Amino acid sequence: DNEPYDENLPKNSIILIGDSMAEGIGVNLENTFAEVLEKEIGRKVLNFGSAAFFGPVQEEILYRTLASELPHNEMIYFFLPANDFTENDRRWWTSRLNKFRHRPYFRKIKNNEYEVFYPNEKIKNKFLISLKSFIFHRIQMLAIQYTYTANTLKTINRLYAKFTKKKDVVNTGISSGYGYFFDDHEAIDGSLYFSKKLLLEASNLERRLIVIIPSQIDFDNMYNGKNYKNLKWYLDIKRISSQTNSILFDLADHFEKEDWEKMVHTCDGHWDIYGNSIVAELIKKNFFE
């Protein structure tokens, strides 16, 4: 956004939280989902979306420590199965390529309970960690902006794990599926633990809307007859929405494969101007009229 976020914001502001889809990668500010929805409904939408490998752990931290302090009475939470189950699971990021990926990850400490940790938390030279993380992050962002390698980083990590046979690394993404058809239970449990934590922290709001966002690959799989609604992640997120009194809104129920192809950039799958606009219009029609 290009406006200050402070205590003078309207009390009926809406928090938007998520990754690069929420931030609006690929379009100008005025064409992002948040800006379009704001103009459509006449209410301030505070955009707390963030690109660069941002998952449920960071989103929970961001809301708890910053966004929750601002005036608002509703939340829109973007959830992307294609990314959100692996962003904060260290097993997916342990190759040498990701040695200095300084991000918060989850780890299980007891049944149904997780904590946040940083991979370099025992190293005393925090400046060196930050410097290496910054350099690595810049390389990643250049790869994402100017090549088709956003997901290639994960692919390299999986291949590294496969050939080195590291036991604490996910050996292949194929057996775990992808996106709407992802079925790594450990990754699902850890990720959704923090999604639920985020929603519970927003329990005082008038409404919490969870928007599940598919990818083109998900539509291809659905077109070929695959069904995801009996998989663990979907059943779990349905249960969480009920437990937190949130509304679950699955975009895959409202678009066809051919529709989606017109809504995204061919280079990376983020919404184009039309995609941001049509999704904002759909959200308005269903929840703000």
Over which residues does each language-model region extend?
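Loop/turn elements at helix/coil->beta-strand transitions in domains of secreted/extracellular proteins
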Residues: G42-K44, P71-M75, S203-L209, T244-S246
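Catalytic His-Asp segment of secreted/periplasmic serine-dependent ester chemistry enzymes
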Residues: I217-M222, N227-E289
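Conserved SGNH/GDSL esterase-like catalytic core that processes O-acyl groups on lipids
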Residues: E23-K108
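Short, amphipathic alpha-helical "lid/cap" segments that border enzyme active or binding sites
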Residues: P56, E60, I188, L192, ...
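Serine-dependent acyl-ester chemistry module
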Residues: A82-K238, H254-W260
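Membrane/wall-proximal cationic-aromatic binding patches
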Residues: D1-E40, K44, V57, D168-F181, ...
